[in-house]
Amino acid sequence: MLAFQKALESGCDGIELDVQLTKDGEVVIIHDEYLDDLTDFTGNVRDYTLGELKSCNAGGKWQEVYGFQPIPTFEEYCEWASGNSLITNVEIKSSVYYYEELEKKTMELIERFGLKERIIISSFNHLSALSCKDFMPDMKTGALVENGGIANAGYYCKKFGFECYHPGVEGLTKEEVELCHKNGIEVNVWTINNMDDLENLYEWGCDGVITNYPDVCKSWLKAKKAKG
């Protein structure tokens, strides 16, 4: 949760996070399906109960600076998010392992805390993202794709009911952005960590970017708008 608070303090407009299910069916926030790289545990998230995972230190390379950082539940995040105005891009992590009821439980928490208007559901598993509409038909969803994108993304998203297209920055073109906008599709691009990419995406009229440096991007955007 510390990372989210730091992001809020940096002035960002929103947060991107990944959700998975524990062995006992609790929705938790963690990027990788396995624990080895980001925590002091080994193995897969799905092989541990929530109680077991709560003793896991997810501080990663920042442990010496920030100490013990537990893996947060999505419920804890939703409670925190209900007290601010941030947009949240929730990635359903179901491409490597399929978690039965992950979509249902995620949507129930979003509804309980009244966050629907500030949520975008995305996934590399497009069926998983779209299945969230079974529980909340007007939920905003994004087609998340790797670098290189997909052909005719604007048509694809419109055809299958996505409101957003979430491509990796590598290989994205101005023409693809224009096609998405022509079809009423928002374009939110990941992961933008250099200024040349940010400049291009701004000129192309992209709707949002996912970055590891929100404070830098916000300062740049503020200066850009000030110049007119």
Task: Label each PLM-derived region with a short phrase.
Residues 1-228:
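Phosphate-group recognition and catalysis centered on beta-loop-alpha active-site segments
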